[in-house]
Structure formats: C-alpha cells, structure tokens
UniProtKB/Swiss-Prot annotation:
Regulation: Inhibited by acetazolamide.
Pfam families registered for this protein in UniProt: Carb_anhydrase
Provenance organism: Bos taurus
Name this polypeptide is given: Carbonic anhydrase 2
Free-text function comment from the UniProt entry: Catalyzes the reversible hydration of carbon dioxide. Can also hydrate cyanamide to urea. Involved in the regulation of fluid secretion into the anterior chamber of the eye. Essential for bone resorption and osteoclast differentiation. Contributes to intracellular pH regulation in the duodenal upper villous epithelium during proton-coupled peptide absorption. Stimulates the chloride-bicarbonate exchange activity of SLC26A6.
GO BP terms: angiotensin-activated signaling pathway; carbon dioxide transport; positive regulation of dipeptide transmembrane transport; regulation of intracellular pH; regulation of monoatomic anion transport
Family in the record: Belongs to the alpha-carbonic anhydrase family.
Predominant place of localization: cytoplasm
Complex formation: Interacts with SLC4A4. Interaction with SLC4A7 regulates SLC4A7 transporter activity.
Keywords: Acetylation, Cell membrane, Cytoplasm, Lyase, Membrane, Metal-binding, Phosphoprotein, Zinc
Localization terms from the record: Cytoplasm; Cell membrane
Catalytic residues in the record: 64
EC number(s) per entry: 4.2.1.1, 4.2.1.69
Length: 260
C-alpha cells in the first residue's frame, strides 16, 4: 500500500515518487529561496492573519509529525490578503525538524537550513471543506515560519509540554485555548510561490507564504521534538528524529517577495 511512506532510508522522500508520481511534478515543495532571484511584486499586500477567535481542539501524533487541530467550521481563524484572493481558514499547524540543530527546516534561504519549520495550514473557504480545497490549485495556503536556535520560546513550550501524552502514532490529547498567533514573529514580511504539500499525497494546491523573520527555539526545546515516536504503541520504537523533505527543483516558478 502507498501508506508506508516515511523518512527512513527505505521509505523516505527519495522513494515517494513510486507511490506518488506527482513527487516529480512541476510545482513541488519545499524549495530553496535564492534571495538574489526573488521578484519584488508591487501587487502583493501585507498579510492579514486574523486569529483572535481561534479555537484549538486537540493535538494528534499522526506518525510523521504532530498536528494541533483547530475548529474550522466557521471563520474563526483566517488568513487573507498577502498574495491571496479570498479567505482561508486555519485547520491545523505542525512542525518539521531535524536530528540536529543545523538542519530540519524544509524551505531553505540561500541554502541555509534552520533547526525546524512551523506550518500553519489554511484552506480556501470557497471550496467548502479542506478535502475539496486540497484538490484545487488555489485551495490551500500554508504559512511557513522558521525556528532559529537561540532563546527558549515560551509560547512553543506550551506545545512541547503536551508531547509526553502523544508519544506514539495515533495518540491524541485535548489541547484547548492555544493562540496560534503566539507562534508568529513580530514582522510578517514574506516570500511567496506556488507549491505543494511537503508530505504525501504531495498535492500541488498550496500557495506558500514563507515568513522572512524566524522565531526562536532553544536547543533544549529542540530535544523535546525528537522524543516523539513514528511508531504506534506496542511496535518497535522508532524515534521521530527527523521529518523534513529536502528542497525540490524550482522549475518554471518565481518566488516573489513582500515588501518591495
């Protein structure tokens, strides 16, 4: 079955194309952002992230990361403007990280890797639900935030403190009242380009919005991510040491930057 993908030697990103041929497609993510080649587009607007009414529900270990899930039945936490047309609802956020602090982000900037990357996943409300939106070229918008090793991040610590209860695949825990805005940097300057999900099914439905300013994470906080398991309870332990896809060819795309 195609559901055996992962990040190991025998099921990792270089193998995904066998079950998911779109892995070699024309708008795959992540990419390296070559800052010298970024196009300044005066049509781009500032991002409007309206997270005031966000309602977090639970946190789930899905066997390749962990998701913090949000109530997306109404316009409670939305993303608008920037490169986007229409309104996009927050459905979940998750992280990608590496086995050491010098790698782990999916996007890179002038080939530089960060320790981790936060993905805030939103879907275009004109399509009615996430599943339908994920099939459309303008269906999803993901905000990527780099995590740079430095001071401990108190907002992130709230998330990390819950990980002990979802150590293995399939476990979930209630996680109410978490403000996703607490994980955003102060400045929302961004790069944007058309891309894909970075995990199978790798659908080419994502407008990527990668923030230029990272948030902080301590080395000790990074260790906590790596205590999760890829495996389910009762299976041989496989630590979630790294879960990032490397940069894919930009092909016929341009990365635009805001502000001018």
């Amino acid at each position: 079955m195609s559901h055996h993908w992962g990040y190991g030697k025998h099921n990792g990103p270089e193998h995904w194309h066998k079950d998911f041929p779109i892995a070699n497609g024309e708008r795959q993510s992540p990419v390296d952002i070559d800052t010298k080649a970024v196009v300044q587009d005066p049509a781009l607007k500032p991002l409007a992230l309206v997270y005031g009414e966000a309602t977090s529900r639970r946190m789930v270990n899905n066997g390749h990361s962990f998701n913090v899930e949000y109530d997306d039945s109404q316009d409670k936490a939305v993303l608008k403007d920037g490169p986007l047309t229409g309104t996009y609802r927050l459905v979940q956020f998750h992280f990608h990280w590496g086995s050491s602090d010098d790698q782990g982000s999916e996007h890179t900037v002038d080939r530089k890797k960060y320790a981790a990357e936060l993905h805030l996943v939103h879907w275009n409300t004109k399509y009615g639900d996430f599943g339908t939106a994920a099939q459309q070229p303008d269906g999803l918008a993901v905000v990527g935030v780099f995590l740079k090793v430095g001071d401990a991040n108190p907002a992130l610590q709230k998330v990390l403190d819950a990980l002990d209860s979802i150590k293995t695949k399939g476990k979930s825990t209630d996680f109410p009242n978490f403000d996703p805005g607490s994980l955003l940097p102060n400045v929302l300057d961004y790069w944007t380009y058309p891309g894909s999900l970075t995990t199978p099914p790798l659908l080419e439905s994502v407008t990527w919005i990668v923030l230029k300013e990272p948030i902080s994470v301590s080395s000790q906080q990074m260790l906590k991510f790596r205590t999760l398991n890829f495996n389910a309870e009762g299976e041989p332990e496989l630590l979630m040491l790294a879960n990032w896809r490397p940069a894919q060819p930009l092909k016929n795309r341009q990365v635009r930057g805001f502000p001018k």
